[in-house]
């Protein structure tokens, strides 16, 4: 069977489980003489594909003498009727030009409406959880494929995830999804050298496709009715001259796979499918780089050296959005692709003058190994449909924010797949979430007490190596000990388990430990133990419970961080993906400080924590810039420095960090003062900290104001509005509010009437009427019992209840 018909049949087969559309029945009139003679003659000389006439036995086919004039070996056919069936289809495969144009034209039509139905699967174990979702979108057919396997074998803790983005058809991608991980398990280095095994599988997959068409049995099984009948029965028997199998010429697939074993993950990829890691705080890290001539100088150079040229940049409009696509690598018959590495696509790998690694397209993967640490949050493995619409940092930031909002991982994955609709391509996304506590942090925590014990053991005053006793298995001396030292001298590098000391004279500044069992002041070590005398310039990157080191414990100084001992790097600028409660570029620490002074409520709690998480994730902890960690005071201005560093007094602390954390404390406690203040009144606070006058107050504009009994401030005075009878004057509450607009005086029929202000200074209620309100007990005149009686109706505006 000719490769054209095989390609045509394979295009109709659906590897995603959908029904295969039957062969298109059409009348094909191929006007051969319309093709320029120069093209015909050059094509014949190239001889890339032998011309042939394919006939179906259940159709009636004619061939005119005009065709015989241009077809080599035309004497094999006579101009007669070749069949006597009721229907006719004439399919001419002349250098695959005519039919290739037909297939290309039909495929570019795509779908007028997107296929938005999604296929989503999720599974988890005690260490990881994954979600995979895929959608056809606006693609003319689904050419993406994937594989997600939590347990790849029965003997090792190995998980496998792979995304395969097919082009020119779905069959190569489908084959990779079904066979790639099996080839990996069967490789001889699978148990001993997983990295090498993964690298070799990329090449073996390419070789399997090129050797024979047996791989298609996985894609088009025997029970697929008419497809297998056409392929293995009818069509194969109508061309009696067998041809060498060449593999899928213009069909291929990318591959981006991740293998997780123990606390390691190995990422291998070829093409433009991508793997991105999110570290703590939403920091995006690309674990793969796209193999495209447009974005990679080395890839572009290889493609051009092999004869590939750029066809230019095409700006295609998809659903009111413009998507930029650059076509590269001009093939023999106008075929082109946008990537420079893939599995398959053998039309671009057959230059006999070049080595395998010099071809226009190669299958060589990039392989990277990474340790999985506790600060890693999740992986995103996706096809180009997603990355055409969103950058890596945007995808990670989106997932991070949605997780903080409590959205399920399944919903997030489907939202990402939906966003790929704008690219006009198929989209497949795999999210792999690392469960908290399942993996170790990069720096393990050490028990300070245990280390102090070890330190005291080596703080001996005995003689040097010659007189000491060796406590380990070494026959001669401790590892790293200076054998040339003599008794009474200091020696560097003693093993921690040794019972000998640095010399009879005790420790010194150059010894591993001083005589008190503490770390020496100038010792440069890579970890941090529970010592109270760490070196001044030591870069501490973990959260160990020490006295004055950055830690997540309840401190007396700030919420979660000892601000008087830590200085934020003034050059640090958070990444753009850190979400804040306002718009604009990411602020520097000095800008944050100015912001806090101007508007203390601008940053909310989550903004501050996200910014701090970003620093810790990117730098492995807050950058400590030389402050002594041995301070005995929490006040940076009055601290007594007990260390040996040059920055004595601990007096150069960046105020931005203290103020930022004060805001954080305000959100949590409802108070905005410096944490170590002794009062909650901003105007009368006795400040015990170092920022007198700078602490954040509740309301500077109401300093000294008293509060009402319902919590409201009342005009900076000491009176309180009675909230039990709002607006009603009574004699039991001094200073009750009265309505200045009232025109009705008090009377006994309307107890609680608003009182006319002029009346309250010159008359009180008469004493012979019960129930009336005493308006002003200090009035200069008293109502006479017979002079004026309250009007029962209470309507006279001049009724003042008596005359003065």
Swiss-Prot record:
Mn(2+) 2 binds at residues 165, 384, 425. It catalyses: O-phospho-L-seryl-[protein] + H2O = L-seryl-[protein] + phosphate; O-phospho-L-threonyl-[protein] + H2O = L-threonyl-[protein] + phosphate. It is a single-pass membrane protein. This is Probable protein phosphatase 2C 18. Its cofactor is Mg(2+); Mn(2+). Belongs to the PP2C family. SUPFAM superfamilies: PP2C-like. Mn(2+) 1 binds at residues 165-166. Residues 468-499, 638-647, 776-789 have a biased composition (Low complexity). Keywords: Hydrolase, Magnesium, Manganese, Membrane, Metal-binding, Protein phosphatase, Transmembrane, Transmembrane helix. One of its GO terms (biological process) is signal transduction. Residues 460-509, 564-599, 623-653, 675-804 are annotated as: Disordered. Binds 2 magnesium or manganese ions per subunit. GO terms for cellular component: membrane. Pfam families: PP2C (PF00481). It comes from Oryza sativa subsp. japonica. Residues 129-434 form the PPM-type phosphatase domain. Residues 628-637, 713-734 have a biased composition (Polar residues). The chain crosses the membrane at residues 19-39.
């Amino acid at each position: 069977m000719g490769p054209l018909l095989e390609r045509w049949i394979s295009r109709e087969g659906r590897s995603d489980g959908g029904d295969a559309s039957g062969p298109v029945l059409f009348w094909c009139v191929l006007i051969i003489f319309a093709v320029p003679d120069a093209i015909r003659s050059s094509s014949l000389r190239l001889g890339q594909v032998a011309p042939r006439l394919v006939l179906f036995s259940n159709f009636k086919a004619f061939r005119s003498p005009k065709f015989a004039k241009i077809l080599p070996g035309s004497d094999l056919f006579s101009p007669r009727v070749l069949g006597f069936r009721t229907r006719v289809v004439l399919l001419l495969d002349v250098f695959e030009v005519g039919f290739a144009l037909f297939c290309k034209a039909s495929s570019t039509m795509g779908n007028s409406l997107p296929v938005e139905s999604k296929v989503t699967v999720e599974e988890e174990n005690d260490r990881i959880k994954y979600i995979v979702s895929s959608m056809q979108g606006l693609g003319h057919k689904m050419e993406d494929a994937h594989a997600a396997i939590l347990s790849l074998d029965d003997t090792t803790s190995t998980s496998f995830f792979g995304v395969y983005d097919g082009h020119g058809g779905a069959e190569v991608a489908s084959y990779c999804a079904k066979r790639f991980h099996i080839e990996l398990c069967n490789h001889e280095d699978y148990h001993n050298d997983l990295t090498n095994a993964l690298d070799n599988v990329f090449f073996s997959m390419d070789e399997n496709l090129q050797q024979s068409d047996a791989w298609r049995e996985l894609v088009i099984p025997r029970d697929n009715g008419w497809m297998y009948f056409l392929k293995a029965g009818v069509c194969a028997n109508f061309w009696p001259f067998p041809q060498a199998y060449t593999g899928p010429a213009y069909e291929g697939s990318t591959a981006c796979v991740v293998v997780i074993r123990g606390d390691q993950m190995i990422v291998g990829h070829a093409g433009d499918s991508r793997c991105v890691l999110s570290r703590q705080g939403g920091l995006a890290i690309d674990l793969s780089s796209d193999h495209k001539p447009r974005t990679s100088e080395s890839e572009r150079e290889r493609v051009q050296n092999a004869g590939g040229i750029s066809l230019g940049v095409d700006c295609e409009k998809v659903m009111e959005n413009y998507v930029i696509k650059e076509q590269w690598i001009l093939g023999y018959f106008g075929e082109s692709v946008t990537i420079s590495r893939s599995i398959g696509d053998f039309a671009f790998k057959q230059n006999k003058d070049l080595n395998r690694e010099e071809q226009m397209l190669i299958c060589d993967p990039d392989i990277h190994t990474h340790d999985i640490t506790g600060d890693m949050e999740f992986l995103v493995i996706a096809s180009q449909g997603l990355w055409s619409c969103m950058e890596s940092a945007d995808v990670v930031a989106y997932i991070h924010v949605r997780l903080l909002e409590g959205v399920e991982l399944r919903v997030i994955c489907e939202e990402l797949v939906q966003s790929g609709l704008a690219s006009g391509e198929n989209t497949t996304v795999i999210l792999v979430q690392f469960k908290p506590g399942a993996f170790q942090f990069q720096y393990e925590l050490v028990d300070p007490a245990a280390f102090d014990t070890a330190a005291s053991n080596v703080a001996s005053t005995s003689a040097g190596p010659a007189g000491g006793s060796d406590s380990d298995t070494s026959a001669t001396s401790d590892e790293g000990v200076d054998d040339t030292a003599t008794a009474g001298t200091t020696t560097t590098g003693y093993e921690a388990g040794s019972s000998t000391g640095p010399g009879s004279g005790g420790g010194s500044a150059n010894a591993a430990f001083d005589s008190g069992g503490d770390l020496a002041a100038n010792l440069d070590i890579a970890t941090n133990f529970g010592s109270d005398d760490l070196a001044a310039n030591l870069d501490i990157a973990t959260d160990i419970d020490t006295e004055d080191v950055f830690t997540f414990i309840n401190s007396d100084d700030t919420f979660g961080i000892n601000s008087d001992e830590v200085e934020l790097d003034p050059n640090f600028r958070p990444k753009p993906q850190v979400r804040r409660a306002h718009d604009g570029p990411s602020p520097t620490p000095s800008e944050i400080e100015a912001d806090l002074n101007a508007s203390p409520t601008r940053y909310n709690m989550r903004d501050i924590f996200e910014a701090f998480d970003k620093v810790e994730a990117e730098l492995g902890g807050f950058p400590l810039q030389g402050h002594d960690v041995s301070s005995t005071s929490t006040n940076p201005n009055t601290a007594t420095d007990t260390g040996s560093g040059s920055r004595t007094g601990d007096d150069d602390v960046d105020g931005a960090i203290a103020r930022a954390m004060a805001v954080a404390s305000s959100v949590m406690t409802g108070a905005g003062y410096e944490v170590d203040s002794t009062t909650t009144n901003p105007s009368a606070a006795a400040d015990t900290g170092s920022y007198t006058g700078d602490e954040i107050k509740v309301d500077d504009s109401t300093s000294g104001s008293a509060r009402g009994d319902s919590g409201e401030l009342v005009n900076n005075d000491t009176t309180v509005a009675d909230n039990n009878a709002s607006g009603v004057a009574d004699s039991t509450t001094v200073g009750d509010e009265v309505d200045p607009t009232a025109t009705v005086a008090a009377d006994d029929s309307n107890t609680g009437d608003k009182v006319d202000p002029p009346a309250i200074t010159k008359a009180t209620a008469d004493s012979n009427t019960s129930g009336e309100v005493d308006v002003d007990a200090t009035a200069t005149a008293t109502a006479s019992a017979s002079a004026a009686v309250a009007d029962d109706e209470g309507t006279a505006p001049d009724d003042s209840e008596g005359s003065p």
